[in-house]
Amino acid sequence: MKRKYILKKESEITAVFRSKKRCGNSSFIIYYSKQNVNTYFKFALSVGKKYGKAHERNLIKRRLRAIIRNYSSNLNPAFFFVIVIKPPAKNLTFQQLKTTFAKFASKINLLLSNN
């Protein structure tokens, strides 16, 4: 993923959480906010230590980055979003993660066109 698509500044991430807009289930929560000035979307991933060991946390982050990369051409450029991953996501396959992300993304109008 290119650096321009990643939320790095704490102030940007805090602003997304303060917007209090969210959508999720027991596996993960997507916090999002709409920005007026962006030409591309930005995102961040958060996995707590309760999720598991480092290699498990890295695996789920790699999977979600791959899913976001797959949908990147269809994601609304006006959005910043943070995905908080919870321990039940361990039991999901890549395909289940992909369908769950697509469902929530279309629900919050993050996708420009449904795939």
UniProtKB/Swiss-Prot annotation:
Transmembrane regions listed in the UniProt entry: none
Indicate yes or no for the key word Heme: no
* GO cellular component entries: ribonuclease P complex
Q: Which domain of life is it from?
A: Bacteria
Q: Which UniProt keywords apply?
A: Endonuclease, Hydrolase, Nuclease, RNA-binding, tRNA processing
Give the record's subunit note: Consists of a catalytic RNA component (M1 or rnpB) and a protein subunit.
Q: What does this protein do?
A: RNaseP catalyzes the removal of the 5'-leader sequence from pre-tRNA to produce the mature 5'-terminus. It can also cleave other RNA substrates such as 4.5S RNA. The protein component plays an auxiliary but essential role in vivo by binding to the 5'-leader sequence and broadening the substrate specificity of the ribozyme.
Q: Return the PANTHER family for the record.
A: RIBONUCLEASE P PROTEIN COMPONENT
- Family the entry assigns: Belongs to the RnpA family.
> What name goes with this protein?
Ribonuclease P protein component
Organism of origin is Phytoplasma australiense
